[in-house]
Amino acid sequence: MNFQHIHHVAILASDYKKTKEFYVEKLGFEVIRENYREDREDYKIDLQLGDSELEVFVVKNAPARPNYPEALGLRHLAFTVEDIEDTVKRLNEKGIETEPIRWDTYTNKSKQKKVAK
């Protein structure tokens, strides 16, 4: 077996309009496919950012994920950016709440990378 890379990550959301606005208008993803699946009464939106794909299922009445990091399931998505301070500023200007920038000493081999949660 020789896995080359992760093709996509699939996540669930509950609000079609807010989800699409967040990923497309605020984060800059491109919609590559979008379907309403009548038999399941949900939307499937395939998004692309560079070489990465995100598959979003917008499902009515999906159970909420517990709001603490140790809950099972997807914990976070991480993005590579050129200037983290500028990126955080622009996210905040778009109404996206961010946490303080911090050094991540566990996953980074040098102090050249910062993480904003």
Indicate where each model-derived feature is located.
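Residue-level marker for the onset of beta-strands and adjacent loop->beta junctions
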Residues: 7, 43, 75, 114-116
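Short, conserved charged micro-motifs
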Residues: 18, 84-88
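Short, charged/polar surface micro-motifs in flexible loops or helix N-caps
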Residues: 50-54, 61-62, 84
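A short, acidic/glycine-rich surface segment
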Residues: 32-34, 42, 56, 61-67, ...
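N-terminal beta-strand motif that seeds the catalytic metal site of vicinal oxygen chelate
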Residues: 1-17, 74-79
